[in-house]
Amino acid sequence: MSMTDVLSAEDIKKAIGAFAAADSFDHKKFFQMVGLKKKNPDEVKKVFHILDKDKSGFIEEDELGSILKGFSSDARDLSAKETKTLLAAGDKDGDGKIGVEEFSTLVAES
């Protein structure tokens, strides 16, 4: 499964372009722009599993740093600051990683 099975390639391209500048990433705006906010819970979970590159059931800090590449291979990596901000927003139980339910909540709060 690829990201374009769930989200529009055009929406992904626009969202990646909007956050091309270093330290410009805003997960709330990004999730809205790619159309993830409008998706049903099962589709949000599909996106989570695509982003969970090592299939551990969690998106760890290193995977968060390359989250944009999960949407488009030519996207940039997040800065350390952006990664930590995203982790802090999504890691509700403080275990240092984002599980599927935490990801679903993060998207819903966007």
Swiss-Prot record:
<dbReference type="GO" id="GO:0010467">
    <property type="term" value="P:gene expression"/>
</dbReference>
<comment type="similarity">
    <text>Belongs to the parvalbumin family.</text>
</comment>
<dbReference type="GO" id="GO:0098977">
    <property type="term" value="P:inhibitory chemical synaptic transmission"/>
</dbReference>
<dbReference type="InterPro" id="IPR018247">
    <property type="entry name" value="EF_Hand_1_Ca_BS"/>
</dbReference>
<feature type="binding site">
    <location>
        <position position="60"/>
    </location>
    <ligand>
        <name>Ca(2+) 1</name>
    </ligand>
</feature>
<feature type="modified residue" description="Phosphoserine">
    <location>
        <position position="8"/>
    </location>
</feature>
<feature type="binding site">
    <location>
        <position position="102"/>
    </location>
    <ligand>
        <name>Ca(2+) 2</name>
    </ligand>
</feature>
<feature type="binding site">
    <location>
        <position position="93"/>
    </location>
    <ligand>
        <name>Ca(2+) 2</name>
    </ligand>
</feature>
<dbReference type="GO" id="GO:0005509">
    <property type="term" value="F:calcium ion binding"/>
</dbReference>
<dbReference type="GO" id="GO:0045202">
    <property type="term" value="C:synapse"/>
</dbReference>
<dbReference type="InterPro" id="IPR011992">
    <property type="entry name" value="EF-hand-dom_pair"/>
</dbReference>
<feature type="modified residue" description="Phosphoserine">
    <location>
        <position position="24"/>
    </location>
</feature>
<dbReference type="GO" id="GO:0005737">
    <property type="term" value="C:cytoplasm"/>
</dbReference>
<feature type="binding site">
    <location>
        <position position="95"/>
    </location>
    <ligand>
        <name>Ca(2+) 2</name>
    </ligand>
</feature>
<feature type="modified residue" description="Phosphoserine">
    <location>
        <position position="2"/>
    </location>
</feature>
<feature type="domain" description="EF-hand 2">
    <location>
        <begin position="78"/>
        <end position="110"/>
    </location>
</feature>
<keyword id="KW-0677">Repeat</keyword>
<feature type="binding site">
    <location>
        <position position="56"/>
    </location>
    <ligand>
        <name>Ca(2+) 1</name>
    </ligand>
</feature>
<protein>
    <recommendedName>
        <fullName>Parvalbumin alpha</fullName>
    </recommendedName>
</protein>
<dbReference type="GO" id="GO:0030424">
    <property type="term" value="C:axon"/>
</dbReference>
<keyword id="KW-0479">Metal-binding</keyword>
<dbReference type="Pfam" id="PF13499">
    <property type="entry name" value="EF-hand_7"/>
</dbReference>
<keyword id="KW-0514">Muscle protein</keyword>
<feature type="modified residue" description="N-acetylserine">
    <location>
        <position position="2"/>
    </location>
</feature>
<feature type="binding site">
    <location>
        <position position="63"/>
    </location>
    <ligand>
        <name>Ca(2+) 1</name>
    </ligand>
</feature>
<keyword id="KW-0597">Phosphoprotein</keyword>
<comment type="function">
    <text>In muscle, parvalbumin is thought to be involved in relaxation after contraction. It binds two calcium ions.</text>
</comment>
<feature type="binding site">
    <location>
        <position position="52"/>
    </location>
    <ligand>
        <name>Ca(2+) 1</name>
    </ligand>
</feature>
<dbReference type="InterPro" id="IPR002048">
    <property type="entry name" value="EF_hand_dom"/>
</dbReference>
<feature type="binding site">
    <location>
        <position position="54"/>
    </location>
    <ligand>
        <name>Ca(2+) 1</name>
    </ligand>
</feature>
<feature type="binding site">
    <location>
        <position position="58"/>
    </location>
    <ligand>
        <name>Ca(2+) 1</name>
    </ligand>
</feature>
<feature type="domain" description="EF-hand 1">
    <location>
        <begin position="39"/>
        <end position="74"/>
    </location>
</feature>
<feature type="binding site">
    <location>
        <position position="91"/>
    </location>
    <ligand>
        <name>Ca(2+) 2</name>
    </ligand>
</feature>
<dbReference type="GO" id="GO:0005829">
    <property type="term" value="C:cytosol"/>
</dbReference>
<dbReference type="GO" id="GO:0098976">
    <property type="term" value="P:excitatory chemical synaptic transmission"/>
</dbReference>
<keyword id="KW-0007">Acetylation</keyword>
<dbReference type="InterPro" id="IPR008080">
    <property type="entry name" value="Parvalbumin"/>
</dbReference>
<keyword id="KW-0106">Calcium</keyword>
<feature type="binding site">
    <location>
        <position position="97"/>
    </location>
    <ligand>
        <name>Ca(2+) 2</name>
    </ligand>
</feature>
